[in-house]
Design a protein with these regions (language model features):
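Unchanged
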Residues: 38-60, 71-128
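Beta-strand scaffold of nucleotide-dependent catalytic cores
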Residues: 19-20, 104
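Conserved N-terminal beta-strand and adjoining loop/helix that marks the start
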Residues: 1-18, 36-39, 88-92
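A short local loop/turn or secondary-structure capping micro-motif enriched for an aromatic residue
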Residues: 26-29, 76
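Nudix hydrolase/Nudix homology domain
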Residues: 28-30, 101-154
Length: 154
């Protein structure tokens, strides 16, 4: 199996972060908008495309905050993700010229049911993946430096 690159957006407005709300057999779970890099596009081009699909908004990409690996065989969904090895690049991003009213995805993933602004202080109450990233976002907002490379975390 090959290693897949993925770009993710950390979009913060005020005290909230924008996440995709998804559903599986265990209920709702939340992910940072973004997805896989396609052949011939840069990681930033992938993020712009994926945000348009999942959030329906143009984003401006800022600082690369974290790089996280996900080696599926090492985590809770190992039986389903045994062949998955993904490198994810998390960028601070912002919505450019946000349209008024509801933000709607243009081409959501099959498990995505909507998008939601989640209070950052309540992130621990949500089933957010990767779980470990929640604490790093809170540290970032407090001005606390964290490593860029986080390793194989979930």
């Amino acid at each position: 199996m090959h290693i897949r690159n993925s770009a993710k957006a950390i979009i913060i407005q005020g005290e909230k972060v924008l996440l995709t709300k998804n559903q599986d057999t265990d209920g709702y779970f939340y992910l940072f908008p973004g997805g896989g890099q396609e052949h011939g596009e840069t990681i930033q081009q992938a993020l712009i495309r994926e945000c348009m699909e999942e959030v329906g908004q143009q984003v401006e990409i800022g600082e690369l905050l974290h790089i996280r690996e996900y080696i599926g065989k090492n985590h809770e969904y190992a039986s389903a993700d045994v062949d998955v090895h993904q490198v994810e690049y998390y960028f601070i991003s912002k919505i450019v010229n946000e349209t008024k009213g509801n933000i709607e995805p243009t081409n959501p993933d099959s498990h995505q049911v909507e998008i939601e602004w989640v209070p950052i202080n309540d992130l621990s109450e949500y089933r957010v993946y990767p779980k470990t990233l929640r604490k790093y976002i809170i540290k970032y907002l407090k001005g606390v430096k964290s490593p860029v490379y986080l390793g194989d975390i979930n």
